[in-house]
UniProtKB/Swiss-Prot annotation:
Keyword Transferase assigned: no
Protein name: Defensin D7
Tissue specificity field: Distributed in the epidermal cell layer of leaves and in the subepidermal layer region of stems. Not in roots.
Source superkingdom: Eukaryota
């Protein structure tokens, strides 16, 4: 899809290391007020 390669626009302040599950990134991005990312 058009959003399949979307990433957080700003590095997460709370999420450390590599994302192992998209849901982790999505939650971190949303928690910090950014659009959902992969």
């Amino acid at each position: 899809g058009i959003f399949s390669s979307r990433k957080c626009k700003t590095p997460s302040k709370t999420f450390k290391g590599y994302c192992t599950r998209d849901s982790n990134c999505d939650t971190s991005c949303r928690y910090e007020g950014y659009p959902a990312g992969d």
